[in-house]
Amino acid sequence: MDFPGLIKKIKEDLENRLVEKSKQPAFTDYWLINKTISLLKEYPSGFSYPILINEIELACSERNKLDNVFSSLEWLTKSDAVIYLEDQFHFHCYDYYYTPIPSLKLKDSEENTCEMILHSSFYLLFHEPFNILKGSTLRFSQSRIHQKWYLRKQIRFLPTTSFVPVLQYAASKSFVKSMVESTEHEFFQIRDITISKSDQGVKRITVELGRIISLDKKGAFLIDNNTNFIHFSGTYHDFPKLLDKQQYLLIPFWSTVWEGSTNWQDGMIGILVILSENDFEEKKCDSWQVGRLAAVNSNFLVLDNNGQRVKILYSNSQKHYFKDTYIGDLLCISPINHSSDNLSDYSCVSDTTTEILSNLENPLSSNFLRNDLCKFSNLFSGVSGHLKIQPLTLVITGFVANLTRQSDLNTSLVLPEVNPLTAKMEVIDCLRNSFWAALRPNCVSYFASMISGFKELFQKEMEFPIYLDLKSYKLGFHWCDIYVDSEHNCHIQKINSLPCE
């Protein structure tokens, strides 16, 4: 099954399951694609389709639960209600007061009210130009309820530093514009959120940020190619959970006080700005495309989608979306917008993301996703899928430095420098048919790790090409992800890390 077919099947099955359980399906294609890909990354050894659909259904239910339970106050008044520090709350701030203790007046979607004592780190939000609390949505966690709240007959949350005001872009354009134009404060796009652990087992969360340079004539964000990283640990480990990937974060006084900081510190404030699909004309579509990367130019790329050529336009500030891609990679690009002039043309938007599906382990180890080509004779121009191959000969042809070539579209193909070596390999399929295929540079590294003395070859002065006979290594059969381009050249994009049975 191909990836678009997989997404279509998941969507149909998930909608049917939710309807059977009297639940309203409430998810977008964009959410479904991202959740599916994150699961494929989480389980690289592979899993069955029933497990996949169950995981996605659970995630969908949890998503709805967060929207309903933690934005309601009713359940908190029950005697058996248990509140955990990691619980997140989303409430609307309708007012605040300064004395005797600076506090916020909050309400849920059913107009039930409560209060929250504001942590002193956020007193800046009472003053111009940051007095945006009234009318905003507040997200917070790591907060307890005042033990004697019942004396006031109103729930009262204690102060917390895991606290983020959330603004809707459409309702705060003038504020956003003034912040982007400011030389003291900085707006960032939240590109990614990753979790890692140190050698001592301490969890650290890293948020990848792209700086907003300016706004275009339509008010859309123009984003710098460079990336900033901020790490969260200790008392701030929960803060990134309050953020949304591909949305926008304002950090006051970044340019004058916090610039160069790599760790979130006491006194830092974040304000989240949410863009809806209708905020800009170019974001009215939520399209996505899957295909093999066939060509890259200075302002567009071309995908080969089962023989159909799809052009996707991007600006200079969006080049980083494709920085790790290589000709022949199977890409999933979303969301993108249809061109008004040509239905086969698309353009990137500010929250476009690119996933290299052919780099995932799962398509090579999960039967429900693998497109088994069975034998070499099934390979022809435009075909892509998976094939069992056994390596015979490895030929190192040179270094990937300023490597370009011409395609049938008469556009210059720029092959990004992913690895310094490029190579081709002679292989055989299960029927003992032999053929040659170009190797994606990361595949060269894979075989280099299996060949003794490989590094020593390049410590000597040797001329390319370098021929290595692999028969004596008895490498066995491996699943590979393979693609045949328009010039009938075979490209091996990914080799399974485990030999086939």
Swiss-Prot record:
It is found in: Nucleus; Cytoplasm. Keywords: Cell cycle, Cytoplasm, Nucleus. It comes from the Eukaryota. InterPro entries: Cdc24_OB1 (IPR035201), Cdc24_OB2 (IPR035200), Cdc24_OB3 (IPR035203). One of its GO terms (biological process) is Okazaki fragment processing involved in mitotic DNA replication. One of its GO terms (cellular component) is cell division site. Has a role in the progression of DNA replication and in the maintenance of genomic integrity. Acts during S phase, after initiation, where it is essential for completion. This is Cell division control protein 24. It comes from Schizosaccharomyces pombe (strain 972 / ATCC 24843).
